[in-house]
């Protein structure tokens, strides 16, 4: 029977399936951080259990950490408590920790792939909703709750219902100035934040095969904003080349053997999906969010919708509520809206390729006098590689702040926050009410668009800096 990529990986990991029961999956990889792991470790201690496979768990500090300094004392009291607790727990249970000052510390969904901890065909979980990122490697990756984190620690298994499958085929090529971030924002804008609910989605097509691993991770990262639990891309030579030589990756002849197996991780010809979507990506323009959920997105040259554009009363109310919060009007042109802060980073767009794209636009320019711009590498490895290329000098000379690794302004959980009423051009993944600080306003966009906004001080078209 022909199978999809998702079905192949899922079925290969079923260790038990009782009658009228959910299948039990073996979990190959477990990523943890300081926010969702403390209660799980406490549960193990109360039950006097050890971890089943501490060697298959990797911990990092990312959500709470200050990006202004690698000194623990730079963090808030709550952050210090969570970070210290993770340090103690990982030491007690024998889990490797990428702590403050570690050359590999960074955002969980960036350090996993760059260390080769994420591999094609594995099951990978984390107490974080954006775990779907790792599906870019052909891994079955999804976010779990704290009780499930404890269960994986104790048993290395999870009960999981099998999801429906959706194929998203991407045809054509991007226009100049359009990136993977624009594609996923466009997809969510067209179909809504609930379209993927109950599905494992697979991105495929001629465009996907040409994308870098960084771009593929951006797509799978925001599968969750599309409503899906899982986003996957079949591995190929681009995947294998990315993995080769990384710390946790197979080595030598073993690597070649794995590559042969990984080549089988693609949907069979004739495999049936529960739903399919086909996109012509050549029509996509730089995308900007205008509201308070990731489906409220328009092209840079478009106007904010009017209430008459929606027939559904709940959608009409959502529009009015969003515009009231972000202080914008129906039928308003998005280009030219004043911004206060630019944030380039996060598990969506904090990789080296993202920083290169931003640097190419910022080079030779100064940011607007009324703008504060934070450039936050997603890991200390990304930071080092960027500095080796001189990107830090470009950012600093432009007037940006060059930070240490962490989640930073993606969420108002650390010391990088926007004040009430401040408008942020952000490369993160969520624009919810107060996401980047109480009363803050978020506009999601690509690193190229964010860099252009930093120069002009308003939402603008990045293509003018690319000769388009």
From Swiss-Prot:
Metal-binding recorded as keyword: yes
One Pfam entry name: Aconitase
Function: Catalyzes the isomerization between 2-isopropylmalate and 3-isopropylmalate, via the formation of 2-isopropylmaleate.
KW Lipid metabolism (keyword) present: no
Recorded catalytic activity of this chain's protein: (2R,3S)-3-isopropylmalate = (2S)-2-isopropylmalate
CDD domains xrefs: IPMI
Species this protein is from: Campylobacter jejuni subsp. jejuni serotype O:6 (strain 81116 / NCTC 11828)
Name used for this protein in its record: 3-isopropylmalate dehydratase large subunit
Lineage: Bacteria, Pseudomonadati, Campylobacterota, Epsilonproteobacteria, Campylobacterales
EC number: 4.2.1.33
Assembly and binders: Heterodimer of LeuC and LeuD.
Amino acids binding [4Fe-4S] cluster: 347, 407, 410
Any one biological process term the GO annotation gives: L-leucine biosynthetic process
Cofactor(s) the protein needs: [4Fe-4S] cluster
């Amino acid at each position: 029977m022909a199978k999809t990529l998702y079905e192949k990986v899922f079925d290969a990991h079923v260790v038990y399936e009782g009658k009228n029961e959910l299948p039990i999956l073996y979990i190959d990889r477990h990523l943890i951080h300081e926010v969702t792991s403390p209660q799980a470790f406490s549960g193990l201690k109360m039950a006097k259990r050890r971890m089943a496979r501490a060697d298959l768990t990797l911990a990092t500090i990312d959500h709470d950490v200050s990006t202004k300094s690698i000194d623990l004392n730079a963090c808030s009291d709550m952050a210090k408590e969570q970070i210290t607790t993770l340090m103690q727990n990982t030491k007690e249970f024998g889990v490797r920790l990428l702590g403050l000052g570690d050359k590999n510390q960074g955002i969980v969904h960036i350090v996993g792939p760059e260390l080769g901890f994420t591999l094609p065909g594995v099951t990978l979980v984390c107490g974080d909703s954006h775990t779907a990122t790792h599906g870019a490697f052909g891994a079955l990756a999804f976010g779990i709750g704290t009780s499930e984190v404890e269960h994986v620690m104790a048993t290395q298994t999870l009960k999981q219902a099998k999801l429906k499958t959706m194929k998203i085929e991407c045809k054509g090529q991007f226009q100049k100035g359009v990136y993977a971030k624009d594609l996923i924002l466009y997809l969510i804008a067209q179909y809504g934040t609930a379209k993927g609910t109950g599905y494992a989605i697979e991105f495929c097509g001629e465009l996907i095969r040409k994308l870098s691993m960084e771009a593929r991770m951006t797509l799978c990262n925001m599968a969750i904003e599309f409503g899906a639990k899982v986003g996957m891309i079949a591995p190929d030579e681009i995947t294998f080349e990315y993995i080769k030589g990384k710390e946790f990756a197979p080595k030598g002849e073993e690597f070649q053997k794995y590559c042969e197996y990984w080549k089988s991780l693609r949907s069979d010809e004739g495999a049936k999906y529960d739903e399919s979507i086909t996109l012509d990506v050549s029509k996509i323009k730089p995308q900007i969010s205008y509201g308070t959920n990731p489906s409220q997105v328009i092209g840079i040259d478009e106007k904010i919708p009017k209430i008459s554009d929606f027939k559904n009363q709940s959608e009409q109310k959502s529009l009015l509520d969003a515009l009231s919060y972000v202080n914008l009007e129906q039928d308003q042109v998005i280009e030219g809206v004043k911004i206060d802060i630019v944030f380039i980073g996060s598990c969506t767009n904090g990789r080296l390729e993202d920083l290169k794209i931003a640097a190419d636009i910022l080079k030779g320019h100064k940011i607007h006098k009324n703008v504060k711009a934070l450039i936050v590498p997603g890991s200390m490895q990304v930071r080092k590689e960027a500095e080796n290329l001189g990107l830090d000098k470009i950012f600093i000379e432009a007037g940006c702040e060059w930070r240490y690794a962490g989640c930073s302004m993606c969420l108002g959980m650390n010391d990088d926050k926007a004040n009430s009423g401040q408008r942020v051009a952000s490369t993160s993944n969520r624009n919810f009410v107060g996401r980047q600080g109480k009363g803050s306003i978020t506009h999601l966009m690509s690193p190229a668009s964010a860099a252009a906004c930093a120069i002009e001080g308003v939402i603008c078209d990045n293509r003018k800096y690319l000769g388009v």
